[in-house]
Amino acid sequence: MKDKRKVLRPLGSGFAMAVPLFIGILVQDPLISSVGAMGAFSYLAFQHRSLFYNLRAILTHGAALLLAFILGAGTALIPWSAPFIIGALSFSAFLLSKVMRIPKPDYFFVLMLYATGFNFHAAHLGEILHHSSYLLYGIAGSLLAGLVISLAEQLPLKEEKTAFQQLSLHEKYSLALSQQPEMVIKALHFSLILFIATYIAYLLRDSNGYWILISAAAVLAGEHMEKIKNRTIGRVLGGIVGLLLGFLLMSLHMPLEAIAVVLIILNILTEFFMPVNYTVANFFTNPQVLLLMTIGTSFMPLKLIPLRFSGALIGSVLAMLLIFLMDWAVKQMEQALGNKPEDTTDHTQ
């Protein structure tokens, strides 16, 4: 059963992405395919728990992605505010994921959709709402995929509420704080690093600088220093191979139908390898990004590849160095406090 689950979940991810891709082809609207495919990331909230849990989790995740995209696109109208908004968003998302025990990928795709929306240059709010509505195709595909895979896995319709689920929000926060007293400090570190990454992305916004923010957030998802190091190496090495593969695929000048099939296969492979080998998963992530960006646009491969690689490199290395510096500073402070001599002065005189 465990081996079956390893295969079914990635297949569901491919199914979710197939819905907006082929609807876009049928109605001849490339925006449904390109933007709608991002809505399919809402399927990644799927867990091996119950049918109702998955539908609720996918719908909640999808709503968060939609709001994040709208917020990011709205921020682009006032671009200097982006670092402050991402700082507040990442801080609250980190804490919420810990307090509510939201499973991975928790907040990552919310931040990614914010960054993608920030790169979307809209003239007014109406245009933002119109384009963000295309995400609904992917969310609908995710709900359908969640239903099908839940039935295929023979998951129960409902599950009994656990003792944790019956706690109030305040009680959940107190419990999380008692189990992870460093939680708020980590949230501050996380949001500060993304504040800096977003400021750099803002400075490089004419060169797809938002990839710096996405890469920094992806690396920080490791949360622990050793995992962050491994994810940095994996993202850079995997990015090199993935970009070469992406260039090869784009140079074939495939019709839209063939691109859709390739994207579905790449998406399935990404989800299959992500929990197994982060480096290998990045072999398939980068071609997906490049192919999605070419749908309905005039981008050339040679222009996209150096921008994508530089964004991945800068964002990954920046995040690793900053978290290392902050981790070192905290340890130095703890060591200094631990070695502080007791005050033996007699104050009774």
Question: What are these regions, as identified by a protein language model?
Answer:
Residues 1-110, 114-283, 290-349:
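Alpha-helical transmembrane segments and their membrane-interface boundaries
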